[in-house]
């Protein structure tokens, strides 16, 4: 009998083991779709970004005009630009759901996969930040100025560090040029890390909603989950199409339609919506260095989650108290996102401070205590 080429060919064999004959738990739900959706988002962003880069000019006197030129004069340039801008938003929606799934079902206990995922999140945030600067509108310029200036909070090296990143004494042409270089390069680094992320995942196999070993009940990835993923792809593409075609500026900031002007500060400087939760945590601490450290720790705290897992059960499926705390965390994130977009005045300052304390308390105190208490209740000690 002739051997199947997909199982013997050196390259096709890798594809086969990843996408076709991969043994997958039979009970994984819709929440396991988001990994493949992130892959789709990355492909969309790289392709649209490549076409935008062909027409974009990374120079402060031409950047804003080149974006207008793309939208007006390039064939379907307006569509490519709208897909790229809104694709970033959907990318972050998928990332946050993917992380939430990992937190809820205990997927973080695959430590290597989880830690690479956190590094991927940092790279994604860096890519989105430098990308937001490129159109060189008011919010691009002032967002870049404010966020990079936070590095000056670090003792001794802070000011030198900021000037090194700026390439001068203010956000200027050198800054825009290097940010364009970073924005072009980082997605390829993300792609490489994504391959390693998947590699580590396939060393252990996927987790499942029960949090139990599923070796006795696996099914092949194709056709079962390839079709299930295809449904997710279709849903995402319809959403992205609707957003890019009907409401392309819904998630953007009106200030960015004004060319960058170093002499006029916008009334409210704020980043894109997907950074607002971290921005709210940053603003809730009156001390500059304290705020920067809180901002960093709001993401780095994800690295501590596997170490703070106290429950004898992996998943939250049968842990009611942990479920309550998880949904408080989700609500808290939404509150922080809302606060990040509000002006710095009462009662927003107080709400932001309470939400920030709650955010860290849930990770560091509430969740570990809930796991310990549930062990006691179920006499699993």
From Swiss-Prot:
* InterPro entries (alphabetical): Cyt_b/b6_C, Cyt_b/b6_C_sf, Cyt_b/b6_N, Cytb/b6-like_sf, Cytochrome_b, Cytochrome_b_C_euk/bac, Cytochrome_b_N_euk/bac, Di-haem_cyt_TM
Extract the Pfam families matched here.
Answer: Cytochrom_B_C, Cytochrome_B
Cofactor binding comment, as recorded: Binds 2 heme b groups non-covalently.
Sorted alphabetically, the Gene Ontology BP terms of this entry are: mitochondrial electron transport, ubiquinol to cytochrome c
TM region positions: 34-54, 78-99, 114-134, 179-199, 227-247, 289-309, 321-341, 348-368
Which annotated residues bind a ubiquinone?
Answer: 202
Q: Which cofactor does it need?
A: heme b
Arranged from A to Z, the UniProt key words for this protein are: Electron transport, Heme, Iron, Membrane, Metal-binding, Mitochondrion, Mitochondrion inner membrane, Respiratory chain, Transmembrane, Transmembrane helix, Transport, Ubiquinone
What are the subcellular locations of this protein?
Answer: Mitochondrion inner membrane
Cellular component terms, GO, for this chain's entry? Answer: mitochondrial inner membrane; respiratory chain complex III
> What's its membrane topology?
Multi-pass membrane protein
> Which protein family is named in the record?
Belongs to the cytochrome b family.
What's the stated role of this polypeptide? Answer: Component of the ubiquinol-cytochrome c reductase complex (complex III or cytochrome b-c1 complex) that is part of the mitochondrial respiratory chain. The b-c1 complex mediates electron transfer from ubiquinol to cytochrome c. Contributes to the generation of a proton gradient across the mitochondrial membrane that is then used for ATP synthesis.
Subunit comment for this entry?
The cytochrome bc1 complex contains 3 respiratory subunits (MT-CYB, CYC1 and UQCRFS1), 2 core proteins (UQCRC1 and UQCRC2) and probably 6 low-molecular weight proteins.
- Name-wise, this protein is Cytochrome b
Q: What is the lineage of its organism?
A: Eukaryota, Metazoa, Chordata, Craniata, Vertebrata
């Amino acid at each position: 009998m002739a051997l199947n080429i997909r199982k013997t060919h050196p390259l096709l064999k890798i594809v086969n083991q990843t996408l076709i004959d991969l043994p997958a738990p039979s009970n994984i739900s819709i929440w396991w779709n988001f990994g493949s959706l992130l892959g789709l988002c990355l492909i969309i962003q790289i392709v649209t970004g490549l076409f935008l880069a062909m027409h974009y000019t990374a120079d402060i006197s031409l950047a804003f005009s080149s974006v207008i030129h793309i939208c007006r004069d390039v064939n379907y340039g307006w569509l490519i630009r709208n897909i790229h801008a809104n694709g970033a938003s959907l990318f972050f929606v998928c990332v946050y759901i993917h992380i939430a799934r990992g937190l809820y079902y205990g997927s973080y206990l695959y430590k290597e996969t989880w830690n690479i995922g956190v590094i991927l999140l940092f790279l994604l945030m860096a890519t989105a930040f430098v990308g937001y600067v490129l159109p060189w509108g008011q919010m691009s310029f002032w967002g870049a100025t404010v966020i990079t200036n936070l590095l000056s909070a670090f003792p001794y090296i802070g000011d030198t560090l900021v000037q090194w990143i700026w390439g001068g004494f203010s956000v200027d042409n050198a800054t825009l040029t290097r940010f364009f270089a970073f924005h072009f390069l980082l997605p390829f680094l993300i792609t490489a890390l994504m391959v390693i992320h998947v590699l580590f995942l396939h060393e252990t196999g996927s987790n499942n909603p029960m949090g139990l070993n599923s070796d006795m009940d696996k099914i092949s990835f194709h056709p079962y989950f390839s079709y299930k993923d295809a449904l997710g792809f279709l849903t995402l593409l319809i959403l992205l199409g609707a957003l890019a075609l009907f409401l392309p500026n819904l998630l953007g900031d009106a200030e960015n339609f004004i060319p960058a002007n170093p002499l006029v500060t916008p009334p409210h400087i704020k980043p894109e919506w997907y950074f607002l939760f971290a921005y709210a945590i940053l603003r809730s601490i009156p001390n500059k260095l304290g705020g920067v450290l809180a901002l960093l720790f709001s993401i780095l705290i994800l690295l501590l989650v596997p170490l703070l897992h106290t429950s004898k059960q992996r998943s939250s499926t049968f842990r009611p108290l942990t479920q309550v705390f998880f949904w408080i965390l989700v609500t808290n994130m939404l509150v922080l996102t809302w606060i990040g977009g509000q002006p710095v005045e009462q009662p927003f300052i107080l709400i932001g401070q309470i939400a920030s304390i709650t955010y860290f308390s849930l990770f560091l105190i509430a969740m570990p205590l809930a796991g310990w208490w549930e062990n006691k209740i179920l006499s699993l000690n």
